């Protein structure tokens, strides 16, 4: 469905939650190193429960390694950032899109963030004066909005059945 990219995630339970989300939504998860934890971390595994076997998780040595090996279409890469100009609710997502999220404590590195055209830097609306949402919550909000726009294709949702 969609490609979720976590660039240098730091907190094991957040990644575990995203693994579970990927399994339940049919997304592929890309983890860009360095990771702030071991993939065997008990907190990450607990958050992902037994969903690891149902999620497609790929690891990449760096942001450039992901770009070189996966070759995502430049026009379908979206950076989720508090520095975003547009809202995830204003973007029209397509199956196969790449949804890119930065580290919990610092977001995307400036060089990665600045490599995205301003129109592809998106944010989730928040109340004024708030810094950011939790990473796994932001991923969930974004993925479900993208999936909703595509009729929850592949799910048991009635909208998905209407498309068949």
Swiss-Prot record:
Its EC number is 2.1.1.207. GO terms for molecular function: RNA binding; tRNA (5-carboxymethylaminomethyluridine(34)-2'-O)-methyltransferase activity; tRNA (cytidine(34)-2'-O)-methyltransferase activity. Homodimer. Keywords: Cytoplasm, Methyltransferase, S-adenosyl-L-methionine, Transferase, tRNA processing. It catalyses: cytidine(34) in tRNA + S-adenosyl-L-methionine = 2'-O-methylcytidine(34) in tRNA + S-adenosyl-L-homocysteine + H(+); 5-carboxymethylaminomethyluridine(34) in tRNA(Leu) + S-adenosyl-L-methionine = 5-carboxymethylaminomethyl-2'-O-methyluridine(34) in tRNA(Leu) + S-adenosyl-L-homocysteine + H(+). The keyword tRNA processing applies. InterPro entries: Alpha/beta_knot_MTases, SpoU_MeTrfase, TrmL, tRNA_m1G_MTases_N. S-adenosyl-L-methionine binds at residues 80, 102, 124, 132. Belongs to the class IV-like SAM-binding methyltransferase superfamily. RNA methyltransferase TrmH family. TrmL subfamily. This is tRNA (cytidine(34)-2'-O)-methyltransferase. GO terms for cellular component: cytoplasm. The gene is trmL. One of its GO terms (biological process) is wobble position uridine ribose methylation. It is found in: Cytoplasm. The keyword Cell cycle does not apply. Methylates the ribose at the nucleotide 34 wobble position in the two leucyl isoacceptors tRNA(Leu)(CmAA) and tRNA(Leu)(cmnm5UmAA). Catalyzes the methyl transfer from S-adenosyl-L-methionine to the 2'-OH of the wobble nucleotide.
């Amino acid at each position: 469905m969609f490609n979720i990219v976590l660039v240098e995630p730091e907190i094991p339970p957040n990644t575990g939650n995203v693994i579970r989300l990927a399994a339940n939504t049919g997304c592929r998860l890309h983890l860009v190193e360095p990771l702030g934890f071991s993939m065997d971390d008990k907190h990450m595994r607990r958050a992902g429960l037994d969903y690891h076997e149902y999620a497609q998780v790929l690891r990449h040595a760096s942001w450039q390694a992901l770009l070189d090996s996966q070759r995502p279409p430049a026009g379908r890469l979206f950076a989720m950032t508090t520095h975003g100009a547009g809202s995830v609710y204003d973007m029209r997502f397509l199956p196969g899109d790449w949804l890119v999220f930065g580290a919990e404590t610092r977001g995307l590195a400036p060089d990665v963030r600045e490599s995205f055209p301003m129109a592809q830097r998106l944010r989730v609306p928040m109340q004024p004066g708030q810094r950011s949402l939790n990473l796994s919550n932001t991923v969930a909000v974004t993925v479900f909005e993208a999936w909703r726009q595509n009729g929850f294709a592949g799910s048991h949702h009635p909208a998905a059945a209407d498309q068949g």
